[in-house]
C-alpha cells in the first residue's frame, strides 16, 4: 500500500471553522490525495451545491410527470440522492429508522436520528430535519402499531400541506406495517422505486463531472492494486490494497 501523507484540515474551510465552534462536522466531498490526482488529470470538481439543487428538481419534475403529491423515501440510496447526507447506510437497509419526504411543492423534510441535524447541515435545500418515528420491532418493541400510526399521521399532514391537493404518495419501500398505516390515513400509495430510477437516470452536468472524478480515482486505485500484486498474496491482501487506495 502506498504511504499517503496525513490529510490536514484547511483552516479556511467553512466546515472546519464551524466544527471548531459547534464541536462536530460532516465534511462531504473529496480530500487529498484525490484532489491532487484529479488536478494532474485535468479534471474539474463538481459544484456540489448545484448538484444538490439539480437532484431535488429532478425528483419534483418526475413527481409532476407522474401526477404525484409527494414521495416518501426509505431506500438509503434514494435518501442520499435527495438529501446528499449519509448516515449508517448499511444498517438502515435492515432497520427503517431514517427517511425523507419530498412534496409536490419541493418541500424536502429529512427524518433522522435525534441530534443528527449536523449530518445534513451542509445542504441548504433541506427545509426541515425532524426526529424519525420508528416502527420496526428492533427499535419499537411492543409499540410498533402505535409508532406506525404516529409515523403515518405525520406523513399524512405533510402530504396535505405540501402536496398538490391530492393523496397520491409514492413510496420506494417499507414494511407491511408501514404500508398499512399509511393507507389507513387515506393515502393512495404508488410504487416509488420506478419514480426515483426515472429521476436519477438523467444526469446533470455536475453529476457527470463527479463521475469523471470517481472513475479517475478508481483507475488510480486499480493501478496501485496491480502494482502490489505478487505471488503468494491472498485475495484479501490484494483486495485490502484496493480498498486502502479507494478510501484514502
Provide a role label for each language-model segment.
Residues 1-220:
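A composition/biophysics-driven feature that prefers long, compositionally simple stretches
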Residues 53, 172-173, 232-244:
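An alpha-helix initiation/capping motif
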Residues 166, 225-231:
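Short helix-to-loop capping/linker segments positioned immediately adjacent to catalytic or ligand/cofactor-binding
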Residues 197-201, 229, 233-236:
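Short, small-residue-enriched loops and turns at beta-alpha junctions
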Residues 215-225, 235, 239-243:
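Active-site pocket-lining segments that scaffold enzyme catalytic pockets across diverse folds
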Residues 246-248:
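Short, intrinsically disordered, charge-balanced linker/junction segments flanking boundaries
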Amino acid at each position: 500500500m502506498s504511504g499517503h501523507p496525513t490529510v490536514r484540515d484547511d483552516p479556511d474551510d467553512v466546515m472546519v471553522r464551524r466544527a471548531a465552534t459547534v464541536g462536530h462536522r460532516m465534511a462531504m466531498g473529496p480530500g487529498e490525495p484525490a484532489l491532487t490526482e484529479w488536478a494532474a488529470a485535468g479534471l474539474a470538481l463538481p459544484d456540489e451545491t448545484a448538484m444538490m439543487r439539480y437532484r431535488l428538481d429532478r425528483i419534483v419534475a418526475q413527481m409532476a410527470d407522474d401526477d404525484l403529491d409527494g414521495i416518501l423515501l426509505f431506500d438509503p440510496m434514494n435518501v442520499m440522492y435527495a438529501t446528499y447526507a449519509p448516515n449508517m447506510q448499511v444498517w438502515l437497509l435492515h432497520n427503517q429508522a431514517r427517511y425523507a419526504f419530498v412534496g409536490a411543492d419541493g418541500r424536502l423534510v429529512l427524518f433522522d436520528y435525534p441530534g443528527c441535524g449536523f449530518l445534513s447541515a451542509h445542504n441548504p435545500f433541506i427545509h426541515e430535519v425532524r426526529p424519525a418515528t420508528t416502527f420496526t420491532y428492533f427499535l419499537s418493541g411492543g409499540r410498533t402499531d402505535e409508532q406506525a400510526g404516529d409515523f403515518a399521521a405525520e406523513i399524512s399532514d405533510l402530504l396535505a400541506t405540501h402536496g398538490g391537493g391530492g393523496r397520491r404518495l409514492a413510496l420506494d419501500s417499507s414494511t407491511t406495517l408501514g404500508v398499512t398505516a399509511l393507507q389507513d390515513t387515506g393515502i393512495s400509495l404508488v410504487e416509488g422505486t420506478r419514480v426515483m430510477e426515472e429521476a436519477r437516470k438523467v444526469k446533470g452536468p455536475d453529476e457527470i463531472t463527479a463521475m469523471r472524478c470517481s472513475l479517475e480515482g478508481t483507475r488510480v486505485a486499480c493501478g496501485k492494486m496491480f502494482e502490489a500484486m505478487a505471488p503468494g498474496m491472498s485475495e484479501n491482501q490484494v483486495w485490502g490494497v484496493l480498498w486502502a487506495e479507494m478510501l484514502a
